[in-house]
């Protein structure tokens, strides 16, 4: 019976440890900038006055992905997405839209 308690306590501690590790990974991913295939700390995010716009560079297994966060929505391709009236809009190649980053 005592052995069962030790196993349960051990499994619970592993579970808690994995949750804390995942939350630290998420925090670390949110403040990264891509440079030469490496993600580096980025102190600045883009917050424009017109809306809640953030450019976030994230390292996914050594590959840097850039997202545009617009009013709580995340657009997967920053180069083709922009925030218009609080919504993410995906523009076509070569198309210009107001308030879109170039």
From Swiss-Prot:
Belongs to the DEFL family. Keywords: Antimicrobial, Disulfide bond, Fungicide, Plant defense, Secreted, Signal. GO terms for biological process: defense response to fungus; killing of cells of another organism. It is found in: Secreted. The keyword Iron-sulfur does not apply. Residues 1-28 form the signal peptide. Disulfide bonds join 39-100, 64-83, 70-88, 75-90. One of its GO terms (cellular component) is extracellular region. This is Defensin-like protein 285.
